[in-house]
Amino acid sequence: MKTKLYLPIISLLAMSVFAFISCDDSDSDTTKPVIELSEPEEGQELKIGDEHGVHFEMDLSDDVMIKSYMIEIHSNFDHHSHGKSRAAATGEATVDFSFNRSYDISGKKTAHIHHHDIIIPANATPGDYHLMVYCTDAAGNETYIARNIVLSTTAEGDDHHHAE
């Protein structure tokens, strides 16, 4: 009778010890993913109103597994002097451009990303912007890369177009 009582207790104790050993942090993923952004380049001028979109290309990698990446573009006008903007000088109505989109790429250790999803509308305010790319792995480690870009009506359009 006592054997029947001790067996469940010993089994529960053994499972608890196994669970604590399995939770050892020495095997957890603490390495951030790597971003190698090819396009757009630092300081690159991007054409406002180009219906083909911005040529965006990068390679992502992680030692275990990538989960997602996010692209963010926002204005960087605050570092300028307080002169008149092009919109104020010409009387044209423009809007500060922003872009924020996440992409799920779960299940891969490496990914080559190439697309033209970023469309800069014709009424975007020309000037300096920040392009931020964030990458998160399956363990929640995040890394980012930042680029300074310029939106311009006089920039040359991108000749690098592919059918998706």
Labelled PLM ranges:
Residues 2-5, 15-45, 156-164:
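Bacterial Sec-dependent N-terminal signal peptides
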Residues 51-53, 66, 126-130:
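Extracellular Ig-like/FN3 beta-sandwich strand-entry sites
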Residues 53-65, 75, 137:
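Extracellular acidic, Ser/Thr/Pro-rich low-complexity tracts
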Residues 133-135:
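Conserved structural position at the C-terminal beta-strand
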